[in-house]
Design a protein with these regions (language model features):
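Short beta-strand/loop motif that positions the catalytic acidic residue
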Residues: 264, 270-272, 276
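Catalytic histidine neighborhood in serine/cysteine hydrolases
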Residues: 290-306
Length: 340
């Protein structure tokens, strides 16, 4: 797909540097109203033998003759987020204004789904994406699916793009990842750096607040949670064993999207910033993207983590870029990509 994105765009004042781009939503929270949309609550049962339920919303802008686009945009949030985070609302608003149906989902155990789930999502938990795709594709009012994954869910989508169950369920979908932790080990290593101490502490504190609310958490696990100091320790003692991995390293190796992306069978746009304080861009640069014509990398000079505020753009540039990508990605052939 021949699309050109201005990866050397100038940052919009005052968001100069990766840290300010990253913290922009905290320092200047966007005010996004969605009160002109008809909202349908979604409940999608998991298919893994649990009674877990995935919760989401389907939104259509009110006051028109229905959606102008025959596409449903599915939005997935990042680590410790939910479907009502600021970036989710921004994307919802953008796509509603351009005539799309929007589905925004909570990942397993996130947000309002927390009390209905005994398991949690993780960076490679793609079976739930297949379940979501199957549920939406079964509806006559869905049309084509277009997926946007923010941060952790971006890794999930880039991994799922090579997996037959998801590819068949999503049927001619397209995928955009934004600030995905493409190499989970590299991301954990970056978080352990001294310069990222405040970010790490912020996320660990959120984990400590959210995890005790999870059904089935034992008292000894709650006590152990109080001693966790880094994301790596959390993955070692909770994420990995909870999902059958022997260690955090095994979990990282088995679920990093960089292992799978060259085998993608759906069009994928991967947006990341070189000055993202959380995500190392070097694993992105190490991939020979041209080996698979379905892949489009956008490794930007600036943008931070899920920031991407550019001069001349009212909204983060990933809103317009993702829409351009979806519009350009008509039904492609499904080639067998060459291996590394």
């Amino acid at each position: 797909m021949s699309l050109a994105f201005d990866i050397n765009y100038r940052p919009k004042a005052p968001w100069f540097g990766g840290d300010l781009q990253t913290m922009s939503a905290v320092l200047s929270p966007p005010k996004v109203a969605l009160d002109d949309a008809d909202i349908e609550d979604l409940r999608i049962p998991a298919d893994d033998g649990t009674e877990d339920v995935l919760l989401g919303q389907r939104l259509v802008r009110r006051g028109s003759d229905g959606p102008r686009q025959e596409t449903t945009v599915v939005l997935l949030h990042g680590l410790l987020g939910d479907f009502d985070r600021d970036y989710m609302r921004l994307l919802t608003r953008h796509y509603l204004d351009h005539g799309y149906i929007v589905v925004r989902m909570n990942l397993r155990g996130a947000g309002s789904s927390r009390l209905l789930c005994t398991r949690n999502y993780h960076a490679g938990f793609t079976q739930d994406l297949t379940v979501i795709a199957q549920a939406l594709s079964a509806r006559e009012d869905t049309g084509r699916l277009a997926w946007i994954g923010i941060s952790l869910s971006g890794n999930m989508l880039l991994k799922a793009a090579s997996e037959t169950p998801f590819v068949e369920a999503a049927d001619q979908a397209a995928i955009v990842s934004i600030s995905a932790p493409f190499d989970l080990q590299a991301t954990a290593t970056r978080f352990s750096r001294r310069r990222n101490f405040l970010y790490s502490r912020y996320l660990v504190n959120k984990i400590r607040k959210q995890m005790p609310l999870q059904p089935g958490l034992r008292p000894d696990q709650v006590e152990h949670l109080k001693r966790i100091k880094t994301i790596g320790e959390f993955d070692e003692h909770f994420t990995a064993p909870d999902h059958g991995y022997g260690s955090a390293d095994e979990y990282y190796i088995e679920n990093s999207a960089k292992r799978f992306v060259l085998d993608a069978r759906l069009p994928c746009l991967a947006i990341v910033a070189a000055n993202d304080p959380w995500i190392d861009d070097r694993p992105y640069r190490a991939i020979e993207w041209s080996k698979n014509p379905l892949l489009t990398p956008a490794i930007c000079r600036t943008g931070g983590h899920v920031g991407f505020h550019a001069q001349g753009h009212r909204q983060p540039i990933y809103t317009a870029w993702s829409r351009s990508f979806f519009e350009a990605s008509s039904k492609p052939a499904t080639p067998t990509p060459s291996r590394r």
